[in-house]
Amino acid sequence: MLLKLAPAFTLLNSHGENLSPMLSTSSQGFVLKNFSTKSRNGLLVVCASKGSNTKPLTGVVFEPFEEVKKELMLVPTVPQVSLARHKYSDQCEAAVNEQINVEYNVSYVYHGMYAYFDRDNVALKGLARFFKESSEEERGHAEKLMEYQNKRGGKVKLQSILMPLSEFDHAEEGDALYAMELALSLAKLTNQKLLNLHAVATRNNDVQLADFVESKYLREQVEAIKMISEYVAQLRRVGKGHGVWHFDQMLLQEEEVVA
């Protein structure tokens, strides 16, 4: 039964409490819902109906102590097993270790380039600083991956690093252009390795690893490829002669401004 009341009407219970919030408006006044009415001695008596439902809207009640029992049984008790590891597959762990090795190898190559251009008979200080900073950046990438490996409960397994080149002079291109083209190739190779790591994470439904690779590596790698590509284009324009020195000075000044 629905009871229509005038807008100015105030409904009180036996204790004098206002029940007006229980009213919903309509075009003709107020409609009282979930209440039954009856007349007693000429007075209107309103009683709460039994149709109210206090169950959760979704029908699902979260019971943490019941649901955590399964996870509690999986907590390792052996000291050699990681306590933090959760939803981290062996494939993802191995792929992260491979990427650590890639970053260290690229860092080693860049460090060799830094040593070459810092020689007294080469003396291209701008290129030397650029490759030294690039080497430190790649090593930082490797260390960041190592930290992530430990964070996820994996084990860091360092692999061997190949000996890099020590000479970068090229008969046709010259040392500056040859080294920068090599750096561009390494940047693209690193990007491909990162894409492979992201694919492994996606294949194993590891959303956290995929997000880590996207946010910390892939965006930055695209920017590095663009920057090195511009350096290659500029070095191709200036040739092997006096223009290389001007390019090196420009590079040195840019790095000093950034620093």
Curated annotation (Swiss-Prot):
Residues 86-239 form the Ferritin-like diiron domain. Fe cation 2 binds at E138, Q221. Its main location: plastid. GO terms for biological process: intracellular iron ion homeostasis; iron ion transport. PROSITE patterns: FERRITIN_2, FERRITIN_LIKE. CDD domains: Euk_Ferritin (cd01056). Its EC number is 1.16.3.1. Fe cation 1 binds at E103, E138, H141. It comes from the Eukaryota. GO terms for molecular function: ferric iron binding; ferrous iron binding; ferroxidase activity. It catalyses: 4 Fe(2+) + O2 + 4 H(+) = 4 Fe(3+) + 2 H2O. Residues 53-85 are annotated as: Extension peptide (EP). Belongs to the ferritin family. Oligomer of 24 subunits. There are two types of subunits: L (light) chain and H (heavy) chain. The major chain can be light or heavy, depending on the species and tissue type. The functional molecule forms a roughly spherical shell with a diameter of 12 nm and contains a central cavity into which the insoluble mineral iron core is deposited. This is Ferritin-2, chloroplastic.
